[in-house]
């Protein structure tokens, strides 16, 4: 997969390890790339929100990881 940032790669790793059935469905329907780009975009927006609100970037990235990247719903 090209063009993925760390959040996109983390989402892919999360799906591979915890939700292979969701990963398979996304692949079968040709939606995996879109899903990963959307997840990384949402995570980036969340980090920006938190940093703007005064949180340090490493902490904000950890929150985005929990809230966006490790979410089980699609």
Which residue ranges define each predicted feature?
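C-terminal alpha-helical interaction appendages
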Residues: 1-74
């Amino acid at each position: 997969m090209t063009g993925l940032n760390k959040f996109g790669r983390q989402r892919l790793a999360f799906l591979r390890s915890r939700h292979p059935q969701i990963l398979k469905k996304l692949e079968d329907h040709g939606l995996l790339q879109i899903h990963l780009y959307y997840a990384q975009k949402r995570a980036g927006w969340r980090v920006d929100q938190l940093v703007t609100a005064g949180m340090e970037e490493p902490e904000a990235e950890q929150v985005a990881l929990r809230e966006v990247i490790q979410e089980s719903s699609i």
